[in-house]
C-alpha cells in the first residue's frame, strides 16, 4: 500500500505541460511555410513524433510525417514522393510552394508509453490568393477591381487595404463576402497631377502582416473623371460576378480536396490515424490501469 501511495503521489505531482491554443496561420499562394513543433518539457525517450493534416472539418486525416524522437537521423523527414511537405531536423513541418489544397488543420503529436502529447501544436492554415481585374464605369472611366480570397473560406473582417503606409487614396469602395474581400478603385477627384500619372502599389493585409501586393498601371488621363455611382449595371454586375466566381472557386477547391482525401483513405483503410480532439492529453501512465481490478458491475 505504501508503494502504491507513493506511486500515485509521484504521478499526481508531475507538472502539467503548457500548450498554446489553436493558431490561425495565413500563407500566400506559392510561398513557403514552416510550422514549429517544439520539444515538450518532459520526454521518456520512446516517443514517436507525427504530423497530421486534415483539409476540412469531418474529412479523413492524413499522416504526413512520422519519426522516433530518440533516434535522430540526418534526414528525419519521410514525406511522400509527390508531397511538398518535409520534416526538418528540428521537427518543424516545412511546406514548399503552398497551394489551395494545402489549406486545413495541421497538428503534431508525440506519443509514447508514458507521455502522450496528442495535440501538442495545432495550426489552422489558410491560403491567401489575389486577383486583379479592370472595370469600366457608366461615364467610360476605367476602374480597377482587386480581389483577396482565402481557402478555406472564413471571415475577412480584419483585412485592411493600404497604399504605402496609409489608407488607399482616391475614390474607393470595399466589399466583404464569405472568404473574400474586394476593393473597387476609380480615378479620384482633386488628386494632384503627378499622383495621377504614377503607378501605385496596393496591399491587401491580413493578420500576422501577411498580404498580397497589386500593381496599378499609370494613368494616361491628365484629368481623371470621378467614378459614377451605381446608376448603371456595369460596375455592380461585375462586382456580383466576381464575388460569385470567388465563392464558386472555393467550393470547387474544397470538393477536390475532399475527393482526394477520400481516395487516399480508401487505399489505407487498414491504417488507423488518431483524429483531432480539442482537448490536450498530456501525461498518461499505461501501467496505472493494472494496479487495481475493475469494479464489479451492479444492476
UniProtKB/Swiss-Prot annotation:
The modification Phosphotyrosine is found at residue 283. It is a single-pass type I membrane protein. Keywords: Cell membrane, Disulfide bond, Glycoprotein, Immunoglobulin domain, Membrane, Phosphoprotein, Signal, Transmembrane, Transmembrane helix. It is found in: Cell membrane. It comes from the Eukaryota. Homodimer; disulfide-linked. Interacts with GRB2 and GRB7 in a phosphorylation-dependent manner. One of its GO terms (cellular component) is plasma membrane. N-glycosylated. Residues 259-299 are cytoplasmic. Residues 20-124 form the Ig-like V-type domain. May play a role in the downstream signal transduction pathways involving GRB2 and GRB7. Residues 1-19 form the signal peptide. It comes from Bos taurus. The chain crosses the membrane at residues 238-258. Disulfide bonds join 37-108. Glycans are attached at residue 90. Pfam families: V-set (PF07686). This is Lymphocyte antigen 6 complex locus protein G6f. InterPro entries: Ig-like_dom, Ig-like_dom_sf, Ig-like_fold, Ig_sub, Ig_V-set, LY6G6d/LY6G6f. Residues 20-237 are extracellular.
Amino acid at each position: 500500500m505504501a508503494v502504491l501511495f507513493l506511486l500515485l503521489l509521484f504521478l499526481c505531482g508531475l507538472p502539467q505541460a503548457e500548450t498554446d491554443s489553436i493558431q490561425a496561420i495565413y500563407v500566400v499562394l506559392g510561398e513557403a511555410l514552416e510550422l514549429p513543433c517544439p520539444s515538450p518539457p518532459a520526454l521518456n525517450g520512446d516517443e514517436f513524433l507525427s504530423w497530421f493534416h486534415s483539409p476540412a472539418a469531418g474529412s479523413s486525416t492524413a499522416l504526413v510525417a512520422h519519426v522516433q524522437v530518440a533516434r535522430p537521423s540526418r534526414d528525419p523527414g519521410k514525406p511522400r514522393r509527390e508531397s511538398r511537405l518535409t520534416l526538418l531536423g528540428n521537427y518543424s513541418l516545412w511546406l514548399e510552394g503552398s497551394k489551395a489544397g494545402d489549406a486545413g488543420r495541421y497538428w503534431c503529436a508525440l506519443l509514447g508509453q508514458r507521455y502522450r502529447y496528442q495535440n501538442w501544436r495545432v495550426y489552422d492554415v489558410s491560403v491567401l490568393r489575389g486577383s486583379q481585374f479592370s472595370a469600366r464605369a457608366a461615364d467610360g472611366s476605367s476602374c480597377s477591381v482587386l480581389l483577396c480570397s482565402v481557402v478555406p473560406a472564413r471571415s475577412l473582417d480584419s483585412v485592411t487595404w493600404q497604399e504605402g503606409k496609409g489608407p488607399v487614396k482616391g475614390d474607393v469602395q470595399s466589399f466583404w463576402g464569405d472568404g473574400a474581400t474586394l476593393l473597387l478603385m476609380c480615378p479620384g477627384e482633386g488628386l494632384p497631377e503627378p499622383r495621377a500619372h504614377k503607378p501605385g502599389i496596393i496591399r491587401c493585409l491580413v493578420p500576422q502582416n501577411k498580404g498580397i501586393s497589386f500593381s496599378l498601371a499609370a494613368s494616361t488621363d491628365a484629368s481623371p473623371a470621378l467614378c459614377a455611382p451605381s446608376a448603371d449595371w456595369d460596375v455592380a454586375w461585375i462586382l456580383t460576378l466576381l464575388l460569385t466566381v470567388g465563392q464558386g472557386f472555393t467550393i470547387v477547391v474544397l470538393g477536390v480536396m475532399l475527393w482526394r482525401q477520400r481516395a487516399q483513405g480508401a487505399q489505407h483503410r487498414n491504417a488507423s490515424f488518431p483524429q483531432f480532439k480539442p482537448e490536450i492529453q498530456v501525461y498518461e501512465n499505461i501501467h496505472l490501469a493494472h494496479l487495481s481490478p475493475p469494479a464489479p458491475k451492479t444492476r
